């Protein structure tokens, strides 16, 4: 295992299951919280988010607190990057100040290019452009594993804006490592151009067909901030054709589980009523975020 977590090429199948096991081990006895483990009181962690974040940043901060590490939230708006300092120079300054690990989110696909230049500071990719978000996928795999024992038996359907989702790219990388039975990609063709002829799954433009026989359904929001062209489908038509709701789920397997990496645009890709169904695991994903990120920090510090 690499000393950094940038994408799933850094991980083996054993690494992934070790993360899941360790994350579960951090749960309290009643499984309603996570234990405080003062494992890394001498470690300094900086979070540097060049894009907005709620769940990812907060769960990393709570994870670091639970592990006893020092957590510094880098204020990008008041930094010298606004004076023209490059990202790499800013990170170099952090390294020289003794930062042990940087949790980095960036709007562009740049993280994997320069981490090799840093020998004394580790990196976690907390979201890189539209190409990767490995810790979110580890959380998703942990959540699936709680309900479905064997990945190799799973029919998985992913619905929504696939072309602009970093989550789906990391998920595809990971699921090829742990195994799967089938993957169906579903959404409006404007948002799924890269998946219409995918070598690892089938594209199905009709939601009813895509949901049949699915063991896991992941729905994704439209990433309006990344769209470069106007969609040829209107909002009301999109909701009618692609929203996951109580009615659309009637064709799905009753044992199916429903995921969403967040943030959710309720009333668009997912109805509020569907999110309250027992087989919707969004709350589990949020809860598992803390434990999985505790596991990631622990494993990476053991590689330092």
PLM feature segments, named:
Residues 44-97:
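Active-site cofactor/substrate anionic-group-binding motifs, chiefly glycine-
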Residues 37, 91-94, 99-174, 260:
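Anion-binding alpha/beta catalytic cores of soluble intermediary-metabolism enzymes, centered on
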Residues 255-256, 261-304:
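Adenosine-phosphate binding glycine-rich loop
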Residues 50-61, 146-220:
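Glycine-rich phosphate/diphosphate-binding loop of Rossmann-like nucleotide-binding domains
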Residues 1-58, 62:
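Positively charged, low-complexity intrinsically disordered leader regions
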Residues 151, 177-179, 247-255, 277:
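Short, conserved loop/helix-junction motifs that constitute active-site signature segments
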Residues 197-273:
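Rossmann-like adenosine-cofactor binding region
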